[in-house]
């Protein structure tokens, strides 16, 4: 991935389609903008005598603003700033994020001295437990056993629907941030209705994939084929580490199931169409138009027993999921649930699980990998 080196300021756009910006207007704009920025950033320093403001130190006064405003506004910063080790990009926003991170860590460190049982101490203890790899190693899979035992109790498709419903997550945002894929088989987002502005609607969005995108399962690209092989190996290895026999066969079944789910899902481009927000289904529509899933069991376990109306963002994904629940062997679904229970919590399982999860993360993501301390902080927040 190309390194992004962000000086933290926007550049003025060049004139479009040959349009001429009058010099007087440009000069007035630059003077007003520069004066406002200087005033807003330098007042505190001028009052306490600490010397040049942060903004003034980023400026290269040797450059005439009208010739190259970017070089004028950022030249000093670019000369004095180097890219920190392990970072692909660095700018004022990154500096602020790092400053906030250090402050949060300090707060958590202080919270470790709070009275036992207090809210602050519980937060600090959570982070400390995440970092205590020796204790994690000693516990083995004990913390995961209740989840795996719950999967073992699934004896029919109604029980399966309940367990799938329990896994619904509010981790999507189709209208705002364009998040069209949930970690659960379906994601929920409550957003403003497009027809009744004073009302909110319950949006249902596709999910259920272990890889980031449907194309990771369906594309014939050699890189995607290699990624699928890597993912299958992760499934096999985690099931093996957890003590499940026939792990190779189980891994193939899980990958085949996720591939089938992906085939019915919407592409990124199709999912980005806001006309999807106009597809309203009642509870009875799910029963009639997406047979195969016990929707009453699913929604009840998801905590949506009283919700009667939904906006379905990707219709084919819902009907496809229901069809897979109806047709796919129950044991394949149970292996799917077993693997995802293990993978979801791999970072707080013994080192072999965490290492395998990190290896898959490296295969699917670019950029520097977060340290355990960074992952612990993210989990705590």
Locations of regions flagged by a protein language model:
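Active-site-surrounding "flap" and adjacent substrate/cofactor-binding loops of secreted or lumenal enzymes
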Residues: 64-68, 72-135
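Bacterial N-terminal signal peptides
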Residues: 25-38
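Boundary at the C-terminal end of the N-terminal hydrophobic targeting segment
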Residues: 44-46
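A charge-rich, low-complexity, intrinsically flexible signal that marks solvent-exposed coils, linkers
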Residues: 56-57, 62-65
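Noncatalytic, helix-rich "gating/capping" subdomain that lines the substrate-entry/channel surface
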Residues: 111-381
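N-terminal secretory signal peptides that target proteins for export/translocation
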Residues: 1-18
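Short, Gly/Pro- and small/polar-rich lid/capping loops
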Residues: 48-57
């Amino acid at each position: 991935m190309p390194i992004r080196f962000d000086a933290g300021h926007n550049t003025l756009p060049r004139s479009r389609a040959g349009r001429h910006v009058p010099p007087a207007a440009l000069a007035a704009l630059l003077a007003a903008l520069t004066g406002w920025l200087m005033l807003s950033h330098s007042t505190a320093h001028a009052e306490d005598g600490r010397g040049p403001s942060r903004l003034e130190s980023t400026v290269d006064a040797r450059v005439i603003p009208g010739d190259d405003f970017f070089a004028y506004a950022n030249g000093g910063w670019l000369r004095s700033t180097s890219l920190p080790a392990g970072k692909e990009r660095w700018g004022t926003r990154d500096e602020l994020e790092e400053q906030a991170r250090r402050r949060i860590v300090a707060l958590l460190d202080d919270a470790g001295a709070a009275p036992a049982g207090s809210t602050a101490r519980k937060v600090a203890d959570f982070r400390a437990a995440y970092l205590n790899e020796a204790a994690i190693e000693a516990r083995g899979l004990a913390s995961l056993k209740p989840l795996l035992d719950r999967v073992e109790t699934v004896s029919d498709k109604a029980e399966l629907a309940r367990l799938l419903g329990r896994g619904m997550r509010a981790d999507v945002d189709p209208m705002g941030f364009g998040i069209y894929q949930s970690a659960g088989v379906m994601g929920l987002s409550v957003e403003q209705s497009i027809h009744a502005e004073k009302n909110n609607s319950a949006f249902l969005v596709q999910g259920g994939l272990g890889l980031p995108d449907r194309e990771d399962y369906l594309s014939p690209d050699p890189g995607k084929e290699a990624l699928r092989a890597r993912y299958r190996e992760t499934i096999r290895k985690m099931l093996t580490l957890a003590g499940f026999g026939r792990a190779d066969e189980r891994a193939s079944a899980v990958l085949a199931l996720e591939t089938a789910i992906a085939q019915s899902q919407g592409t990124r481009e199709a999912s980005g169409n806001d006309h999807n927000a106009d597809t309203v289904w009642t509870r009875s529509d799910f029963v009639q138009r997406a047979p195969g899933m016990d929707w009453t069991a699913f929604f009840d376990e998801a905590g949506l027993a009283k919700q009667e109306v939904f906006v379905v963002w990707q219709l084919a994904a819902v009907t496809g999921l229901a069809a897979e629940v109806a047709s796919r062997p129950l044991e394949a679904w149970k292996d799917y649930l077993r693997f995802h229970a293990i993978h979801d919590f791999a970072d707080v399982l013994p080192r072999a699980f965490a290492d395998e999860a990190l290896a898959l993360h490296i295969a699917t993501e670019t950029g520097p990998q977060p340290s355990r301390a960074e992952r612990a902080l993210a989990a705590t927040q």
